[in-house]
């Protein structure tokens, strides 16, 4: 951006034609309007650096829930003690959510303090729907809360680092930068400027030429207000300073080149002639850049002394026969950089850059705030998720192969209405007082309903009778049970986890592990679906 503007300025220096006629009314009006546009920047609102309070509040609520779900012993470690200075580094142990003590100590202590009111943790638990949970259930919720709390802590750290690293991008600092460019360091309005501020940094001269420039010396003026004075203020030799080169209503300046004692007050009066602005929106960086370019594009070329305004000869004394202007000197090597590095231009460009950076930071802060709020919402919505997981566990428990098959067999037994057919189908006949008999599943004769094709294995098509492997005390007879089976049903082996006499070799059911793995796979799949 800066390079493009500088290139445009240099091009104008080389190409703009100079007119050495005496200054007349209205000659500098276009520059006056441009300078007024720049001065209006000082009245505009400036955007603020985005706050982090929404994200910090969300994190605080997450920690309050964490503390509320912890046991009393843990809460006591962080509870505020009346009349004693709390040491934030002496807590031992670890929270139920297994967060790092050194990094979270302050947050836990603050959470305990926030929960120290008359109602304690009841409002927090009520908000999460966890008022009546057991201690075991609290541990379950804390386990689920842990990754959320860790993620929130990491985001909060990002948020704080970003905000503290952008402390210089406040609206106050940006406004001060703009005001420095317009009126001088420390001045907040045209009428607050001083003569020394108007004369320019380090200027010990006492004439208008010293401020505005002359044939052999570049201008010392370094604020927009000083440029306004140089380009618009009249001179005593021209109708008592009443020449109106900028505005038909501008005040007269009946002062000679050597008298600048009240130049700063006259400059403020000229600023009062500027048009007002009804724009209430925050100032944008592009507006600053545009206002700068609008003025700097009007630089005129002269013989190694480019200038703004009206010039005839000698220098910018204010006389219509000499110059009402701001002049630079480009005779010696390196002097041309002054044209590209006008102090107030550089300062305003810096203010524009600060606004751009602030807007970028604000977008990131808003995003992190929203992330923390989303995590807070998730933390306080754990109950329905964990209840769903419990239901899935219960469903899986019911779906365990042995139990499921027993229920299926019970359904088959119900179809038999006679004591003569019931026992033949691995069922048993039950009667109450010798009457009202019914056919029910015989637990000692568990059968499984399979999808085997007709004729496969033993028994009827699609049905397999599960042998009583434990009844065999001989390895050979044990393994004979597998004859004709596509999958071994018995095996001479030591016990697995969950089986009795694990160290003893005996004939055992070969489907034990398959059933356990099936049940675990259902639970695992259900929990994975719950999380993702």
Curated annotation (Swiss-Prot):
UniProt signal peptide:
1-23
Is the keyword NAD in the record? no
Q: Where is the composition biased (Basic and acidic residues)?
A: 427-445, 472-484, 494-504
Keywords per UniProt = Cell membrane, Glycoprotein, GPI-anchor, Lipoprotein, Membrane, Signal, Trypanosomiasis
Tell me the compartments it is located in.
Answer: Cell membrane
Kindly list the GO CC terms recorded for this protein: plasma membrane; side of membrane
Pfam families assigned: Trypan_glycop_C, VSG_B
Q: Specify the glycosylation sites in chain numbering.
A: 66, 419, 509
Describe its membrane topology.
Lipid-anchor; GPI-anchor
Segments of skewed composition (Low complexity): 450-470
This chain's function reads:
VSG forms a coat on the surface of the parasite. The trypanosome evades the immune response of the host by expressing a series of antigenically distinct VSGs from an estimated 1000 VSG genes.
What protein name does the entry list?
A: Variant surface glycoprotein ILTAT 1.23
Q: Which organism's genome codes for this protein?
A: Trypanosoma brucei brucei
